[in-house]
Amino acid sequence: RCPNNRGRIIWYDNCFLYISEIYTYEKIDFKHYLYLHNAKDVSGNKKLFNKNTKALLDKLKEKAIRKEQEPYTRDYMYAAGEESLGTTKLYGMMQCTQDLSVKNCSVCLDSIIAKLPRCCNGKQGGRVLNPSCTFRYELYPFVKP
């Protein structure tokens, strides 16, 4: 129990819910991050895996911030996809809160992608969760692209 805290956040794979008494509309939260990762390391070259993971996340970021998307539709500020890594596939997903501008979504996603080495260096899966944006990647499918 947290009697003096009135904010809450719940993260799911396809959405997240953030409730706060602090006015956060159109603002990026740069203070709160939660890092989660798979306990297993990748077999093989970790540097190459990290590079491929960052490339997938960068590609998904560009997809998530497409300006031609209609605001507040199902895929607005959201992207999921996969990348072939030889005989294996890498799956990823990212999203921003829909109150952010496209520019602020991009800034937020850049800030969490930059956390990748700290969070998930060479891990088979990982997440960086933030009240304004989030990403996840795994070596198994966890959302529909």
Residue ranges and their predicted role:
Residues R1-P145:
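Extracellular secretory-pathway ectodomains and N-terminal mature segments of eukaryotic proteins
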